[in-house]
Curated annotation (Swiss-Prot):
The gene is Hsp70Ab. Keywords: ATP-binding, Nucleotide-binding, Stress response. It comes from the Eukaryota. PROSITE patterns: HSP70_1, HSP70_2, HSP70_3. This is Major heat shock 70 kDa protein Ab. Belongs to the heat shock protein 70 family. The keyword Iron does not apply. Residues 610-644 are annotated as: Disordered. Residues 612-636 have a biased composition (Gly residues). It comes from Drosophila simulans (Fruit fly). Most strains have three copies of the gene coding for this protein at chromosome locus 87C1; two tandemly repeated Hsp70 genes (Hsp70Bb and Hsp70Bc) and one in reverse orientation (Hsp70Ba). Some strains, including that sequenced in the Drosophila genome project have three tandemly repeated Hsp70 genes (Hsp70Bb, Hsp70Bbb and Hsp70Bc). Induction: Heat shock induces the synthesis of seven proteins at five otherwise inactive sites in the polytene chromosomes of fruit fly larvae. Two separate sites, producing two and three copies, respectively, code for the 70 kDa protein. One of its GO terms (biological process) is response to heat. One of its GO terms (molecular function) is ATP binding. Pfam families: HSP70.
Length: 644
């Protein structure tokens, strides 16, 4: 059973598999190699991917996207407050955690971001299963290199809820570097800068790639809240203000109008990557008012100027951390859809004094490609060019504990290789102190109050002693997923305690995860029921129209008028019933079909027999077959019926 690689993106996701020495990026059921990270809830069903994005203008309040911008964050995060202004769906606080409120099948539901992400992951898993023809459980999932511990852990939880065994969480730029290194058969030692600007996040990583097989990350930097969505927001704000200026109407109060404007803005943004001007035409955008306008590339660049410039700070930081200067970078590789923006490219090129940028890998698929390779390596595949691949990644943020006075004492420095383990000895702050509270933080600031709290645990039962005498050994163990385990041991008694950091404010408890796993199975069952319901409805519709067509087109003399009217009346009754019972259950459709078949079958059989009899008289036995085939009176579809 192969393992798959999934690029779980803010706006689009992508899945790949490594087999027969090659990576296949797998197209979904719509034939697209990337799938929108959208989940929609309606009165009757749940939609994921393309169908969800296609109906967003009709159902903006119950169509959820950008879950990656919520995952692993606290509700009071200022970034979330900023995003809520742009989202048509409702985000509420549930014990400090953000939850998404929607209406589903007439009921109000609340979903954690992990649940929404897990639904997208299920879609990617099903896409791979349909292609490979077998069930899949093992996967490697990518995250932005700058994701913190709680965001990584929450992504892993989403995989678990989706029924996946997450072999590894790997960093997106590292995965892209893997794709670049293997695809280009690099020779010698090369310093490669991966510039990854996607729909919602931005990463820069510098790697040294040796002979295309040793991938060593030297440094990483980024912004987990910068990407194409932010450029869209700027354009939408500009267009909404233009509409208000022209027509004295504020459409921002109307989610549907805003969504249609956003879709047009996104399309215009893409157009501006290849043209210098984009036209926006939206009929009856708001209160019957059409909106036609043009946006120039220069205007778009001006609207996003500060955001584009902000991409250069992490590049500088990554170079400093790697202790390299610009001239030591051999290749600058662009990844992520937003790197298609000409201004982003020209700023980066100027920063590197006119050096050519490498556009040779597919920016939408490179991350999933690398994830698929890593999945194959972790599941023991030793074939082809991946057999010698070794990947060495780094920690994106420093990790430490709070010591007296609120000082951040680092145990693991940022950009240290992972997995890694560090131990330091601490002592008590006051005489006869019976226990210590170990508070774990991540970040680069000197004081813990300015850093991100990951978790706390207490070590008690320390024997009475003067301050500074007890020896408490604290060990930080950062695993290959970038997830932290912390242990503390009092040396004289040997008392020890350890925790995997579970960010109490941002993380899901095991009980919540178990509940979500059960609910995910329930939703999958409901989706299956909905599919079966639609199949039954289609079977009934198709039978009604086929019978109606056959009777309508029956040659004169084959069917007497009474029988014909009887069939047509019954068919018309059924069509009326279908129109007024669109949400009927599968059993009702099946029952209607049975009833209709019982009524029409004898008449249809009689019609065929008459046709067959006439044929035998006219052209001997040989004509029977042909006559029978045409027995539906001009109906050209199949004339064989399955007998139950």
């Amino acid at each position: 059973m192969p393992a798959i690689g999934i690029d779980l993106g803010t706006t689009y996701s992508c899945v790949g598999v490594y087999q027969h020495g090659e990576v296949e990026i797998i197209a979904n059921d719509q034939g697209n190699r990337t799938t929108p990270s959208y989940v929609a809830f309606t009165d009757s069903e749940r939609l994921i991917g393309d169908p969800a994005k296609n109906q967003v203008a009709m159902n903006p309040r119950n169509t959820v996207f950008d879950a990656k911008r919520l995952i692993g964050r606290k509700y009071d995060d200022p970034k979330i407050a900023e995003d809520i202004k742009h989202w048509p769906f409702k985000v509420v606080s549930d014990g400090g955690k953000p939850k998404i409120g929607v209406e589903y099948k007439g009921e109000s539901k609340r979903f954690a971001p992990e649940e929404i992400s897990s639904m997208v992951l299920v879609k990617m898993k099903e896409t791979a299963e349909a292609y490979l023809g077998e069930s899949i459980t093992d996967a490697v999932i990518t995250v932005p290199a700058y994701f913190n511990d709680s965001q990584r852990q929450a992504t892993k939880d989403a995989g678990h809820i989706a029924g996946l065994n997450v072999l590894r969480i790997i960093n997106e730029p590292t995965a892209a570097a893997l794709a670049y290194g293997l695809d280009k058969n690099l020779k010698g030692e090369r310093n490669v800068l991966i510039f990854d600007l996607g729909g919602g996040t931005f990463d820069v990583s510098i790697l040294t790639i040796d002979e295309g097989s040793l991938f060593e990350v030297r440094s990483t930097a980024g912004d987990t809240h910068l990407g194409g969505e932010d450029f869209d927001n700027r354009l939408v704000t500009h267009l909404a203000e233009e509409f208000k200026r022209k027509y004295k109407k504020d459409l921002r109060s109307n989610p549907r109008a805003l969504r249609r404007l956003r879709t047009a803005a996104e399309r215009a943004k893409r157009t501006l990557s290849s043209s210098t001007e984009a036209t926006i035409e939206i009929d009856a955008l708001f209160e019957g008012q059409d909106f036609y306008t043009k946006v120039s590339r220069a205007r778009f660049e001006e609207l996003c100027a500060d955001l584009f410039r902000n991409t250069l700070q992490p590049v500088e930081k990554a170079l400093n951390d790697a202790k390299m200067d610009k001239g030591q970078i051999h290749d600058i590789v662009l990844v992520g859809g937003s790197t298609r923006i000409p201004k982003v490219q020209s700023l980066l090129q100027e920063f590197f004094h006119g050096k050519n940028l490498n556009l040779s890998i597919n920016p939408d698929e490179a991350v999933a490609y690398g994830a698929a390779v890593q999945a194959a390596i972790l599941s023991g595949d030793q074939t082809g060019k991946i057999q010698d691949v070794l990947l060495v990644d780094v920690a994106p943020l420093s990790l430490g504990i709070e010591t007296a006075g609120g000082v951040m004492t680092k145990l693991i420095e940022r950009n240290c290789r992972i997995p890694c383990k560090q131990t330091k000895t601490f002592s008590t702050y006051s005489d006869n102190q019976p226990g210590v509270s170990i508070q774990v933080y991540e970040g680069e600031r000197a004081m813990t109050k300015d850093n991100n709290a990951l978790g706390t645990f207490d070590l008690s039962g320390i024997p009475p002693a003067p301050r500074g005498v007890p020896q408490i050994e604290v060990t930080f163990d950062l695993d290959a997923n970038g997830i932290l385990n912390v242990s503390a041991k009092e040396m004289s008694t040997g008392k020890a305690k350890n925790i995997t950091i579970k960010n109490d404010k941002g993380r899901l408890s095991q009980a919540e995860i178990d509940r979500m796993v059960n609910e995910a199975e329930k939703y999958a069952d409901e989706d299956e029921k909905q599919r079966q319901r639609i199949t039954s409805r289609n079977a009934l519709e198709s039978y009604v129209f086929n019978v109606k067509q056959a009777v309508d087109q029956a040659p004169a003399g084959k069917l007497d008028e009474a029988d014909k009217n009887s069939v047509l009346d019954k068919c018309n009754d059924t069509i009326r019933w279908l129109d007024s019972n669109t949400t009927a259950e599968k059993e009702e459709f099946d029952h209607k079909l049975e009833e209709l078949t019982r009524h029409c079958s004898p008449i249809m059989t009689k019609m065929h027999q008459q046709g067959a009899g006439a044929g035998a008289g006219a052209g001997g036995p040989g004509a029977n077959c042909g006559q029978q085939a045409g027995g539906f009176g001009g109906y050209s579809g199949p004339t064989v019926e399955e007998v139950d």
